[in-house]
UniProtKB/Swiss-Prot annotation:
The gene is THG1. Mg(2+) 1 binds at D29, G30, D77. It comes from the Eukaryota. Adds a GMP to the 5'-end of tRNA(His) after transcription and RNase P cleavage. PANTHER family: TRNA(HIS) GUANYLYLTRANSFERASE-RELATED (PTHR12729:SF6). Keywords: GTP-binding, Magnesium, Metal-binding, Nucleotide-binding, Nucleotidyltransferase, Transferase, tRNA processing. GO terms for molecular function: GTP binding; identical protein binding; magnesium ion binding; tRNA guanylyltransferase activity. GTP binds at D29, G30, K31, K32, F33, H34, S76, D77. GO terms for biological process: tRNA modification; tRNA processing. Its cofactor is Mg(2+). It comes from Candida glabrata (strain ATCC 2001 / BCRC 20586 / JCM 3761 / NBRC 0622 / NRRL Y-65 / CBS 138) (Yeast). This is tRNA(His) guanylyltransferase.
């Protein structure tokens, strides 16, 4: 193959290879999704269409790399893809893993949009985009704790958001009043506020909202107690 005198510039490229025998998580997050969701009038505190769209995109990513992934877990506008510790996907290059997974997810989001939001076209000035990062975890304990962290975070965020928006929508509070009402409250108190002041039993909220979505490497979308399922989820890995 012919070479030019300018090929020397390739020496300035760097390829960060992730440590071997460590679990890899590629986590994607919606960028400026507060503005995006407001423009497309997402329902608060949860928009079922938007969450199912995220799940469909993540499922396609998992199935594309099912031999390299253990699972994916998502809530709101984020998703975490957990890769096997012995994966050699893209030679474990951080830049490749991060960019290819997030670009595949984003292209699916655009392609599947009309299925979940029929009659609402994406505006060229209001398109979805996501950031992405790769993090490595050295052993089974830390990767289990990572998934647990995201699961617990889902519960904390959803309980707060549910109480916050119900105080606004059902009790007539403005955002500042709702925030003040919830300030300093613990989970049990938020549950009580929802039940006594808003007539909402949090236990009856959809499982997808309360528990997030877990996708197995077979493409199954589950809304389960992740903490109770960790042993089976990571069996053999």
């Amino acid at each position: 193959m012919a070479k030019s005198k300018y090929e020397y510039v390739k020496q300035f490229e760097s390829h960060d290879t992730l440590l071997p025998q460590c679990y890899i998580v590629v986590r994607i997050d919606g960028k400026k999704f507060h503005e995006f969701s407001k423009y497309y009038d997402f329902k608060k505190p949860n928009d079922e269409r938007a969450l199912k769209l995220m799940n469909a995109c993540a499922k396609n990513v998992v199935l594309q790399y099912r031999h390299e992934m253990i699972l994916a877990y998502g809530e709101s506008d984020e998703y975490s893809f957990v890769l096997k510790k012995d994966t050699e996907l893209y030679k474990r290059r951080r830049d490749k893993l991060s960019t290819l997974i997030v670009s595949l997810f984003t292209s699916n989001y655009v392609a599947l949009w009309s299925k979940f939001f029929p009659g609402t076209n994406l505006h060229p000035k209001h398109l979805p985009f996501f950031d992405s990062r790769c993090v490595i975890y050295p052993n089974l304990e830390t990767i289990r704790d990572y998934v647990t962290w995201r699961y617990v975070d889902t519960h904390i965020n959803n309980l707060y958001n549910t109480a916050f928006w119900q105080l606004i929508q059902k009790c007539g509070m403005n955002p500042q009043e709702a925030e003040k009402r919830l300030s300093g409250t613990v989970s049990s108190e938020k549950n009580e506020i929802l039940f006594k002041e808003c007539g909402i039993n949090y236990n009856n909220e959809p499982e997808m909202y309360k528990k997030g979505s877990l996708i197995t490497n077979k493409g199954e979308i589950l809304h389960i107690n992740v903490i109770d399922s960790l042993d089976s989820l990571f069996e053999g890995y």
